[in-house]
Every structure is written in C-alpha cells, then in structure tokens.
C-alpha cells in the first residue's frame, strides 16, 4: 500500500476508535434522543381468577404498592390507582414491584401499548386452593382470639374486618377462637377449621395457655413452636396462607401470678416463633412487639390475660399490617408466568 494511502487508512481507523461519528453543532458527540412519552394511568387489582381481566366481581384494589411501566415507577394510592406522567411510547410491560406487594401476592405483569387509550388494569395474584374462598380470613386461636375481655365479645375481629374493607374493598372474617385451648389443641383442629371455613388466610394466635402446662415451663420450649409450625404447614396444605401472631404479654400488674416470670417466658418463646416463621416463610403479626411499644401495658388489659377494647384494637392493627405489607426480605422475582396481554376496557379475548 502506498505511504499516503496507508496514512489516510490509519487516520480513519483512529477516528473511528476515538468515537468518530455523528457530532453535535458544537463539535461533540450528539446525545441519543429521548423517546417520546405519554401519560399512563390505571389501577392495581386482585385478579382472583387469574385471567388477567378486572372482572366485575373483583373489587379488591391494592394501595401503597409500587408499579413499573417502561422503566417509570409510581406508587398506588386509594383504590389502587396510579398515574405515571411520561412512559415511553410503544410496547411496554406493566407490573407491580414484588418487594412492595402484600405478603404472598405476585404480579405476572401485563403487556400494554403506550399510549394505551384508557386505564391500565394491572393484576396481582394470590395462589389459593381450589376450594378456598378469596378474601375470607380465619381468626384461629384461644380465648384471646374468641374476644374475651372486649365489650362486644368480638375481640379484634370486627375492627380488622372494617380496616381491610376500607383499605382493600372486601373482607369477611370467621372467628374460631376456642377458649382455654393450648397450641397442641390448635394443631389438632386447624385442618378441620380451614376445611369448614374455606378461608384464604389463617390468623394463628396460640401459645398463651401453654404456660399452664408444667412441661412448658420446665422443658422449654416444649411443644409450642412445633405445634405452630404444624399449623403453618397445615394452612398451606389447605391452599391458604398463614399469618402467625406473636404471643401477647400478660398484665404486669398481677405480680401475685408470676407476671414477670411469665412475660420472660413469653419473650423467649416469641423469639423462637419468629425464627420458625422466617424458616417457613410465613408472615408475622407482631402482637407482642406492638403491645410493648405502648406507654402503659396495664392500660391494654381487661384482666391478667385478656386485652380490653384498647388492646384488641392494637391487635387488629398488628394483623392488618401483617396482611397488607410485604413479607420481610421479599424476593424481587415475579410470578413465573410471562406478561399477559392487556385487553382494553369493554373487550374480551
């Protein structure tokens, strides 16, 4: 190759290696143009039958959950609604962010063309057994679950129902509190209770009465944690989801009933219950921790063991948070199913 031709070839090669190409009027490389975007609004709904369509009877909406479309994210508000001001035009996937979904929910995503021409319904799913009734909650435990000590004898159940209906739009409660029972009795009867109620969630609160068993004091932790683990597993076998309540403390004003010793036993047992729940990937309602955060523990009790109305209201908040908030350490993985096709309002596939 002649010397001049070789020189020109080398200069061209160096120019390409150093980023030679389109330049801006000022001499530098031109910026990649930002794709045009459009506003997108919609809502996050509980897709009870997993068909990807917001059917007329599917009334539950999920507030306080992150939604992502085309790399743009927002958080749902009342009624599960979201609004993103500028989403890149074209084919995108709309999906709830897994780490923000309530415990046990998943989001398969929905394919949507931007601009969509209407509200985008984004589905969230909850895997349930074939006979299980969506939005039904089984309160399962002893006399504290039964409601002893509350003025209406309903305990936390009515208040929790009202909170869930206000937040999500639908909830029904079944109370199966059996006074004076221990966790071993709960283990024996939970399968039958779930079979009869066909509940989607079991709100398990057991262990208070185990203290009365000499074995549970002398051979700690006796059968309590194993019985609770069995209840968690039986709940899943029934196609439902477990919420495990930590054991509430007792009223410290009853010193003549070994309140200090008993509350230490409760604290140690709850440490093991939390560990078990983490191993089983079960959501925890932090009843014990929420009680201890209050300025006056005795003010929450009707007697030595049973909460009063104020205490039960606090318990309903503990269970409400457990149901509606993410599972600790929720993985960022979504449902294995790929994106489903967004069907515009008023049409069906």
Model segments located where?
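A short, solvent-exposed beta-strand micro-motif common in secreted/extracellular proteins
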Residues: 88-103
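A short, amphipathic beta-strand motif
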Residues: 40-46, 80
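Active-site segments of SGNH/GDSL-like serine hydrolases
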Residues: 205-209, 232-267
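Oxyanion-hole/transition-state-stabilizing segment in secreted/luminal serine hydrolases
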Residues: 160, 184-225, 248-250
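Short, acidic Ser/Thr/Gly-rich low-complexity loop/linker segments typical of extracellular
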Residues: 53-54, 61, 68-81
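Structured interaction patches on ligand/partner-binding surfaces of diverse proteins
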Residues: 99-123
């Amino acid at each position: 190759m002649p010397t001049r031709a070789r020189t020109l070839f080398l200069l061209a090669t160096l120019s390409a290696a150093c980023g030679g190409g389109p330049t801006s009027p000022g001499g530098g490389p031109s910026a990649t143009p930002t794709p045009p975007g459009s506003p997108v609004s919609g809502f996050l709904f509980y897709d009870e039958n997993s068909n990807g369509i917001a059917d007329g009877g599917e009334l539950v909406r999920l507030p306080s959950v992150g939604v992502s479309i085309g790399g743009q994210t927002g958080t749902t508000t009342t009624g599960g609604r979201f609004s993103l001001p500028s989403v890149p035009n074209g084919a995108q996937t709309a999906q709830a962010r897994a780490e923000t979904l309530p415990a046990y929910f998943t989001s398969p995503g929905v394919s949507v063309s931007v601009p969509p021409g209407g509200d985008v319904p984004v589905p969230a799913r909850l895997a349930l057994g074939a006979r299980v009734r969506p939005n039904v909650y089984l309160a399962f435990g002893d006399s504290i679950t039964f409601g002893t000590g509350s003025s209406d004898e309903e305990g936390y159940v009515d208040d929790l129902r009202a909170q869930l209906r206000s937040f999500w739009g639908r909830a029904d409660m079944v109370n199966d509190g059996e006074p004076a029972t221990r966790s071993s009795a709960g283990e024996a009867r939970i399968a039958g209770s779930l079979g009869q109620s066909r509940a989607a969630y079991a709100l398990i609160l057991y262990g208070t009465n185990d203290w009365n068993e000499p074995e549970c004091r002398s051979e700690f932790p006796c059968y309590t944690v194993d019985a609770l683990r069995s209840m968690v597993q039986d709940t899943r076998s029934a196609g439902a989801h477990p919420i495990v309540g930590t054991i509430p403390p007792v009223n410290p004003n009853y010193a003549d009933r070994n309140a200090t010793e008993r509350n230490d036993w409760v604290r140690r047992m709850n440490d093991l219950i939390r560990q078990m729940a983490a191993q089983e990937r079960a959501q925890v309602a932090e009843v014990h921790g929420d009680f201890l955060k209050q300025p006056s523990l005795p003010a929450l009790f009707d007697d030595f063991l049973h909460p009063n109305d104020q205490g039960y209201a606090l318990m309903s908040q503990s269970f409400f948070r457990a149901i509606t908030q993410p599972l600790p350490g929720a993985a960022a993985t979504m449902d294995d199913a790929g994106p489903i096709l967004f069907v515009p309002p008023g049409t069906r596939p």
